[in-house]
Amino acid sequence: MKESIVQKASTLFIQRGFKSVTMDDLADALAISKKTLYAHFENKEQLVRESSFHVFDSVCHEIEFIKNKAAHPIEELYTVKSAVLKYYQNEDTSPVYQLQKYYPGIYTELKDQEYDRLGIMVQSSLKLGISTGLFRPNIDIDFVSRLYLNGMRGIRDIAIFPPSQFNMKTLFESYLEYHARAIVTPKGLEILNEFIANTDQK
């Protein structure tokens, strides 16, 4: 039952945002009583925490799947961007914005997990890019991976880039181009320019 609650809560939180969904909404959606809901979770914050980590785990698996299917690391970067953007809707309902604003402690916990899980994937992609001649062979993999993940954190920080002033899709695309241009070889640049051109046409 607890796993079913987390799965349903995760879906609703993604669709409507963490603040918007109440425990009453969750009980109704699951066709259970609030008493049953509170038997598994002491309060909404506990459920938000478990749901957030459930979603994060799903995102990591999705990124791993993309990584294994992508033809090369540049394609991987842009495919991951598209996958991640679905969690950034408008300012009122975006689960990421609401988590950062209303549950900053949980948001910080998730950020701490990023290095452990995503850092390994990023470093693997950088190594593949070097071995295939798309990324410069002299880049410092540890430095670049940390810089990349910190940059991704930065563009998602609503204190630095308020949603009312900055479009998340544009931020992602600008940052990806900034990151990739710093590490690609001439061969990689040709492929990168194709992806940028295709993105501009959409």
Regions found by a protein language model. Give the residues of each.
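Helix-turn-helix
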Residues: S4, K8, L12-Q46, E50
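Short, basic, alpha-helical segments at the C-terminal edge of helix-turn-helix-like DNA-binding modules
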Residues: S52-C60
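C-terminal peripheral helix-coil segments that are non-catalytic and often amphipathic
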Residues: S124-L128, T132, Q165-K202
